[in-house]
């Protein structure tokens, strides 16, 4: 079994797991994730910044709730 990798928040703000309120989350358990693939959004002062995977793997789970405030460096999601 491979090691788990956590995807950190690039900056403080509000984390969103989905591109729009009524849309499905960017990723679900078992989905493949490629380097540079978007897994969420951080909102800072009404600006949305894409959170991208820095490594490839299999999506395990979101570690931050949807629409939750997060700090820079906080783990947002986990890959296997």
Predicted regions located by residue number:
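PDZ-domain C-terminal substructure recognizer with occasional recognition of PDZ-binding tails
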Residues: 57, 62-76
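Short histidine-centered loop motifs in beta-beta connectors
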Residues: 17-32, 60-65
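Short beta-strand-turn/beta-hairpin segments enriched in glycine/proline and small hydrophobics
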Residues: 2-23, 41-54
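Absolute protein N-terminus
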Residues: 1-2, 80
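Short hydrophobic beta/alpha edge segments that flank linear recognition/processing sites
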Residues: 28-50, 71-80
